[in-house]
Amino acid sequence: MERVVITGMGAVTPIGNDVPTFWQSLKDGKCGIGPITRFDVSDYKVKLAAEVKDFDISQYVEGREAKRMDKSSHFAIAAAQQAVDQAGLTPGTFNPYRTGVIYGSGIGGLYITETEVEKLINKGPGRVSPFAIPELIPNIVAAHLSMRFGFKGENYCPVSACATANHAIGEAMRAIRHGYQD
Protein backbone atom coordinates (compact mmCIF):
# COMPACT_ATOMS: atom_id res chain seq x y z
CA MET A 1 0.00 0.00 0.00
CA GLU A 2 1.08 3.54 -0.78
CA ARG A 3 2.06 5.91 2.01
CA VAL A 4 -0.24 8.94 1.99
CA VAL A 5 0.91 12.44 2.95
CA ILE A 6 -0.59 15.91 2.64
CA THR A 7 1.70 18.04 0.48
CA GLY A 8 -0.31 21.25 0.23
CA MET A 9 -2.96 23.07 2.23
CA GLY A 10 -5.28 26.01 1.68
CA ALA A 11 -7.74 27.83 3.90
CA VAL A 12 -10.65 30.23 3.61
CA THR A 13 -12.10 30.60 7.09
CA PRO A 14 -13.62 33.16 9.46
CA ILE A 15 -10.16 33.60 11.05
CA GLY A 16 -7.99 33.72 7.95
CA ASN A 17 -8.14 33.40 4.18
CA ASP A 18 -4.83 31.58 3.84
CA VAL A 19 -3.01 28.96 5.90
CA PRO A 20 -0.45 31.25 7.61
CA THR A 21 -3.14 33.71 8.75
CA PHE A 22 -5.47 30.90 9.80
CA TRP A 23 -2.70 29.15 11.75
CA GLN A 24 -1.58 32.34 13.49
CA SER A 25 -5.18 33.12 14.42
CA LEU A 26 -5.53 29.64 15.92
CA LYS A 27 -2.33 30.10 17.95
CA ASP A 28 -3.52 33.52 19.11
CA GLY A 29 -6.90 32.13 20.16
CA LYS A 30 -8.72 34.44 17.77
CA CYS A 31 -12.48 33.98 17.56
CA GLY A 32 -14.14 34.10 14.14
CA ILE A 33 -17.64 34.59 15.51
CA GLY A 34 -19.19 38.03 15.27
CA PRO A 35 -22.37 39.90 14.38
CA ILE A 36 -24.06 38.71 11.18
CA THR A 37 -23.42 41.25 8.43
CA ARG A 38 -24.71 39.54 5.28
CA PHE A 39 -28.41 40.14 5.93
CA ASP A 40 -30.83 41.86 8.30
CA VAL A 41 -31.13 39.80 11.49
CA SER A 42 -33.65 41.97 13.34
CA ASP A 43 -36.39 39.31 12.99
CA TYR A 44 -34.14 36.46 14.17
CA LYS A 45 -33.07 35.34 17.62
CA VAL A 46 -29.62 34.41 16.35
CA LYS A 47 -27.47 37.47 15.72
CA LEU A 48 -24.00 35.88 15.52
CA ALA A 49 -22.21 33.73 12.94
CA ALA A 50 -18.73 32.79 11.79
CA GLU A 51 -18.60 34.64 8.46
CA VAL A 52 -15.63 34.66 6.09
CA LYS A 53 -14.28 38.21 6.10
CA ASP A 54 -12.23 40.26 3.62
CA PHE A 55 -12.34 37.60 0.90
CA ASP A 56 -11.60 38.79 -2.65
CA ILE A 57 -12.39 36.24 -5.36
CA SER A 58 -10.73 38.45 -8.01
CA GLN A 59 -7.35 37.21 -6.71
CA TYR A 60 -8.29 33.79 -8.07
CA VAL A 61 -11.04 34.07 -10.71
CA GLU A 62 -11.84 36.68 -13.38
CA GLY A 63 -14.99 38.78 -12.95
CA ARG A 64 -17.38 37.22 -15.46
CA GLU A 65 -16.43 33.67 -14.53
CA ALA A 66 -16.75 34.49 -10.82
CA LYS A 67 -20.25 35.92 -11.31
CA ARG A 68 -21.42 32.57 -12.64
CA MET A 69 -20.25 30.71 -9.53
CA ASP A 70 -21.62 30.32 -6.04
CA LYS A 71 -19.57 31.55 -3.09
CA SER A 72 -18.91 27.92 -2.14
CA SER A 73 -17.03 27.55 -5.43
CA HIS A 74 -15.16 30.81 -4.76
CA PHE A 75 -13.95 29.62 -1.37
CA ALA A 76 -13.00 26.17 -2.68
CA ILE A 77 -11.07 27.58 -5.65
CA ALA A 78 -9.10 29.91 -3.38
CA ALA A 79 -8.25 27.18 -0.87
CA ALA A 80 -7.41 24.69 -3.63
CA GLN A 81 -5.19 27.20 -5.45
CA GLN A 82 -3.26 27.75 -2.23
CA ALA A 83 -2.90 23.98 -1.71
CA VAL A 84 -1.83 23.34 -5.32
CA ASP A 85 0.73 26.16 -5.11
CA GLN A 86 2.09 24.91 -1.77
CA ALA A 87 2.34 21.36 -3.14
CA GLY A 88 4.24 22.61 -6.20
CA LEU A 89 1.78 21.06 -8.65
CA THR A 90 2.31 22.55 -12.07
CA PRO A 91 1.39 21.13 -15.47
CA GLY A 92 3.79 18.33 -16.29
CA THR A 93 4.56 17.49 -12.65
CA PHE A 94 1.60 15.11 -12.27
CA ASN A 95 -0.36 12.59 -14.31
CA PRO A 96 -3.73 14.30 -14.87
CA TYR A 97 -5.52 10.96 -15.22
CA ARG A 98 -4.25 9.84 -11.81
CA THR A 99 -4.98 13.16 -10.10
CA GLY A 100 -8.53 13.90 -9.04
CA VAL A 101 -10.76 15.90 -6.75
CA ILE A 102 -12.79 14.50 -3.87
CA TYR A 103 -14.50 17.58 -2.48
CA GLY A 104 -16.66 17.33 0.62
CA SER A 105 -19.66 19.57 1.14
CA GLY A 106 -22.53 19.20 3.57
CA ILE A 107 -24.85 21.20 1.31
CA GLY A 108 -24.80 22.90 -2.08
CA GLY A 109 -24.58 26.55 -3.07
CA LEU A 110 -26.81 28.40 -0.64
CA TYR A 111 -25.93 31.87 -1.86
CA ILE A 112 -26.97 31.17 -5.44
CA THR A 113 -30.07 29.33 -4.21
CA GLU A 114 -31.10 32.38 -2.21
CA THR A 115 -30.43 34.93 -4.95
CA GLU A 116 -32.03 32.92 -7.74
CA VAL A 117 -35.17 32.05 -5.74
CA GLU A 118 -35.49 35.75 -4.95
CA LYS A 119 -35.25 36.54 -8.69
CA LEU A 120 -37.82 33.86 -9.49
CA ILE A 121 -40.30 35.28 -6.99
CA ASN A 122 -39.75 38.97 -7.73
CA LYS A 123 -38.88 39.03 -11.45
CA GLY A 124 -40.15 35.75 -12.88
CA PRO A 125 -38.52 32.62 -14.31
CA GLY A 126 -36.95 34.44 -17.26
CA ARG A 127 -34.54 36.24 -14.92
CA VAL A 128 -33.20 33.09 -13.23
CA SER A 129 -29.62 32.30 -14.22
CA PRO A 130 -29.11 29.22 -16.38
CA PHE A 131 -26.19 28.47 -14.04
CA ALA A 132 -28.45 28.29 -10.96
CA ILE A 133 -29.14 24.55 -10.97
CA PRO A 134 -25.56 23.42 -11.68
CA GLU A 135 -24.17 25.88 -9.10
CA LEU A 136 -26.46 24.78 -6.29
CA ILE A 137 -25.49 21.11 -6.63
CA PRO A 138 -22.52 20.37 -4.31
CA ASN A 139 -20.49 18.39 -6.84
CA ILE A 140 -20.14 21.41 -9.16
CA VAL A 141 -17.31 22.56 -6.91
CA ALA A 142 -15.32 19.38 -7.62
CA ALA A 143 -15.97 19.97 -11.32
CA HIS A 144 -14.72 23.57 -11.14
CA LEU A 145 -11.55 22.43 -9.38
CA SER A 146 -10.87 19.60 -11.84
CA MET A 147 -11.34 21.86 -14.85
CA ARG A 148 -9.27 24.67 -13.35
CA PHE A 149 -6.27 22.48 -12.50
CA GLY A 150 -6.53 19.91 -15.30
CA PHE A 151 -7.21 16.99 -12.96
CA LYS A 152 -8.86 14.19 -14.94
CA GLY A 153 -8.91 11.43 -12.32
CA GLU A 154 -11.66 10.65 -9.83
CA ASN A 155 -14.06 13.53 -9.34
CA TYR A 156 -16.93 13.49 -6.92
CA CYS A 157 -18.44 15.04 -3.82
CA PRO A 158 -19.45 12.96 -0.82
CA VAL A 159 -22.25 14.59 1.17
CA SER A 160 -22.45 13.19 4.68
CA ALA A 161 -23.61 16.08 6.88
CA CYS A 162 -21.12 17.08 9.59
CA ALA A 163 -18.80 14.18 8.74
CA THR A 164 -18.30 15.32 5.14
CA ALA A 165 -14.78 16.76 5.48
CA ASN A 166 -13.47 13.62 7.15
CA HIS A 167 -15.37 11.48 4.66
CA ALA A 168 -13.70 13.26 1.71
CA ILE A 169 -10.24 13.03 3.28
CA GLY A 170 -10.77 9.33 3.97
CA GLU A 171 -11.93 8.66 0.41
CA ALA A 172 -8.92 10.52 -1.01
CA MET A 173 -6.55 8.63 1.29
CA ARG A 174 -8.02 5.28 0.23
CA ALA A 175 -7.84 6.20 -3.48
CA ILE A 176 -4.12 6.93 -3.09
CA ARG A 177 -3.34 4.09 -0.69
CA HIS A 178 -4.94 1.49 -2.95
CA GLY A 179 -3.28 2.84 -6.09
CA TYR A 180 -6.28 4.34 -7.89
CA GLN A 181 -4.90 7.89 -7.72
CA ASP A 182 -1.53 9.51 -7.11
Feature names for model-found ranges:
Residues M1-G108, I112-E154, R174-R177:
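Conserved "HGTGT" condensation-loop signature of ketosynthase/thiolase-family condensing enzymes
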Residues A168:
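Active-site histidine-anchored catalytic micro-motif
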Residues A165:
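Short conserved active-site loop signatures built around small residues
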Residues E171:
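Internal active-site segments that recognize and position negatively charged phosphoryl groups
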Residues E154-S160:
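Short loop-beta-helix segment that forms the pyridoxal 5′-phosphate
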Residues Y180-D182:
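Short, high-confidence coil segments that cap the C-terminus of an alpha-helix
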